Swiss-Prot record:
Residues 1-11, 83-97 have a biased composition (Basic and acidic residues). This is Huntingtin-interacting protein M. One of its GO terms (molecular function) is structural constituent of chromatin. SUPFAM superfamilies: Histone-fold (SSF47113). May interact with the N-terminus of HD. GO terms for cellular component: nucleosome. Residues 1-25, 74-117 are annotated as: Disordered.
Length: 117
């Protein structure tokens, strides 16, 4: 147990200002941050108002990210639909080249049955 206590740093050591560019980027899942804030494991270091603020900020950022992703998906979907319509118009204008040499077309008469009766 004494090893664990010696490894933990008190909150007062966190007062040193660290250059953010010197730290490697850390990617932490939103659920993990939310759970930590809910469990209030860092209560001795941050006050309840700070915890509330961070939770509100996390909710706001999550909503914003979802809104941006949704609008991007809608824009991409609309672009794909307009491109599909342009392709369809181009295909309607020119007959298909693969069927030019076919001995029949879709509008020819249906041949009669081969057997009678």
């Amino acid at each position: 147990m004494s090893e664990k206590k010696s490894q933990e740093k008190p909150c007062s050591d966190n007062n040193q200002i660290e250059d953010p560019s010197s730290r490697p980027e850390v990617q932490v899942p939103v659920n993990y941050v939310y759970r930590i804030l809910q469990e209030e494991q860092y209560t001795p270091c941050i006050g309840s108002t700070t915890s509330d603020f961070l939770l509100a900020m996390l909710d706001y950022l999550t909503d914003y990210i979802l809104e941006v992703v949704g609008s991007e998906a809608n824009i991409n979907n609309q672009q794909n639909i307009s491109q599909d319509r342009e392709r369809q118009r181009d295909n309607d204008r020119e007959p298909s080249r693969g069927f030019k040499n076919a001995p029949f077309s879709l509008f020819d008469e249906m041949p009669g049955p081969r057997r009678n009766g």
